[in-house]
Amino acid sequence: MAASLTLMTSPPCSRSSKSPSPSPSPSLSCNQQQQYKPLLHHQWPPQISLKKEKSNESIVAKSPVIAAATKGGSPSVQEQKWIHEGVITESLPNGMFWVKLDNCEDLVLGYISGRIRRSFIRVLPGDRVKIEVSRYDSTRGRITYRLRNNKDATTT
């Protein structure tokens, strides 16, 4: 027990100085060199790897952070919306409309999506539309498609 205490209390490195008086910066001499490992295992900035996809032969750059985030089963934006069909009852300024949903008597305040705006698709009261309603606020939605006639309305 005493031998183990002396081994535990003896320092692994011995101080060597030229004078017996303590110097401000003594040098350490060790038999074993300790290698320090970095605390972070990844490098900054992240290394970007370029690889070709076989499906469309385009080069896709993925960083390790983005690739790790997409591997998980995170829900996409489309899963957080309910898609309904309805009839526009009233037109409001700035591309907003009151939409009456088919499955219930609810009125939803809908705004025109960017694709419909970009394509200059005219939406008027009385038109049938597809609307994405948010799960978090069921009184608002995005008008994503204007149904042209009864054939489009029945083939959803």
UniProtKB/Swiss-Prot annotation:
Subcellular location per the Swiss-Prot or TrEMBL entry: Plastid, Chloroplast
Occurrences of domain S1-like (ranges): 72-148
SUPFAM superfamilies registered for this protein in UniProt: Nucleic acid-binding proteins
Domain of life: Eukaryota
Keywords: Chloroplast, Initiation factor, Plastid, Protein biosynthesis, Transit peptide
Major localization listed first in the record, in broad terms: plastid
Compositionally biased intervals (Low complexity): 10-20
Stretches for region Disordered: 1-35
Entry GO CC: chloroplast; cytosol
InterPro entries: NA-bd_OB-fold (IPR012340), RNA-binding_domain_S1_IF1 (IPR006196), TIF_IF1 (IPR004368)
Transit peptide, from-to: 1-49
Keyword Kinase in annotation: no
Keyword Transit peptide appears in the UniProt entry: yes
GO function terms (MF aspect): ribosome binding; RNA binding; translation initiation factor activity
TM regions (residue ranges): none
Subunit structure: Component of the 30S ribosomal translation pre-initiation complex which assembles on the 30S ribosome in the order IF-2 and IF-3, IF-1 and N-formylmethionyl-tRNA(fMet); mRNA recruitment can occur at any time during PIC assembly.
Family classification: Belongs to the IF-1 family.
General function of this protein: One of the essential components for the initiation of protein synthesis. Stabilizes the binding of IF-2 and IF-3 on the 30S subunit to which N-formylmethionyl-tRNA(fMet) subsequently binds. Helps modulate mRNA selection, yielding the 30S pre-initiation complex (PIC). Upon addition of the 50S ribosomal subunit IF-1, IF-2 and IF-3 are released leaving the mature 70S translation initiation complex.
PANTHER family: TRANSLATION INITIATION FACTOR IF-1, CHLOROPLASTIC
Name of the protein: Translation initiation factor IF-1, chloroplastic
Species assigned in the record: Mesembryanthemum crystallinum (Common ice plant)
